[in-house]
């Protein structure tokens, strides 16, 4: 099962693979049950996993920065 495959959610590389998989399923509607499109599906899953890892890393870094900002406010200069 794949996550939402809407084009605006993924990189161009993954969108190409999504379109290839959809086209393969459309053209080979019986053979897809016997693994005809599995190679494209494997590549798509690799791409989606890489996207997920990148987004998770960015989110973690953003969270760390926000926690630093909230819990360690900059010292104001006293006059």
Curated annotation (Swiss-Prot):
Main location: mitochondrion
One matching Pfam family: Cmc1
Intrachain S-S bonds: 14-47, 24-37
Compartments, as annotated in UniProt: Mitochondrion
Residue spans crossing the bilayer: none
InterPro entries for this protein: Cyt_c_biogenesis_Cmc1-like (IPR013892)
Keywords: Disulfide bond, Mitochondrion
Motif (Cx9C motif 2): 37-47
Domain CHCH as annotated: residue spans: 11-55
Source organism, top-level taxon: Eukaryota
Motif (Cx9C motif 1): 14-24
GO CC list: cytosol; mitochondrion
UniProt keyword Disulfide bond present: yes
Function according to Swiss-Prot or TrEMBL: May be involved in cytochrome c oxidase biogenesis.
Family: Belongs to the CMC family.
Protein name: COX assembly mitochondrial protein 2 homolog
UniProt organism field: Homo sapiens
Gene: CMC2
